[in-house]
Amino acid sequence: MTPQDFYRTLEKDGFLLSSKQKEQFDTYFKLLVEWNTKINLTAITEKNEVYLKHFYDSIAPILQGFLANEPIKLLDIGAGAGFPSLPMKILFPNLEVTIIDSLNKRISFLTLLAQELGLENVHFFHGRAEDFGQDKAFRGQFDVVTARAVARMQVLSELTIPFLKIGGKLIALKAQAADQELEEAKNALCLLFGKVIKNHSYQLPNGDSRFITIVEKKKETPNKYPRKAGLPNKKPL
């Protein structure tokens, strides 16, 4: 998917990018490739692949109608090189984006990237989701939490749901069907008062299958969740 293909595909979906937005995506690509030689951000560095498998894939929840261009408080867990939240932010500038990542070098990259792209209302924090999930400044504060290829739903639910307001939504982007994952996550979702409201499949323009699972938070998360760092992964609910 060349940049021009990317623009045309978005235009067909009703999103006409401004010259500023096109420049932002171009700068994003260049900085991603440059920084990838210093720290491991991605295995995908070929331009057409980045536009398809990172940029287009990241904004899929918007293209599929699951997010609006409003001042929604959005948290991205384990965003790595900023996916999916920063491409979303470029497309929908009104989003207020917070990223938590456990690697400080990635936070350094994201901070510089946001400055170079001229993004406002973006915040970056270094640390573990389990620790921030028990911090009152973060817990129960977000309308949406996004996670792209972070963990199985059984683990992911404990890392994300505590951050949501009641009625808030987890948007999980997956490369594989989540049916088996959701079956395994039933107990975790029950304990965390999360309900799967959508399990959506779609295709990238090259025909690759992708999946979006949306979980709504129904009640306050019990105080004991999330458990200490590492436990959700070692002993899933």
From Swiss-Prot:
Keyword Translocase: no
EC number: 2.1.1.-
CDD domains, alphabetized: AdoMet_MTases
Compartments where located: Cytoplasm
Main localization (coarse): cytoplasm
Domain of life: Bacteria
Record family assignment: Belongs to the methyltransferase superfamily. RNA methyltransferase RsmG family.
Function: Specifically methylates the N7 position of a guanine in 16S rRNA.
Record's protein name: Ribosomal RNA small subunit methyltransferase G
Provenance organism: Streptococcus pyogenes serotype M2 (strain MGAS10270)
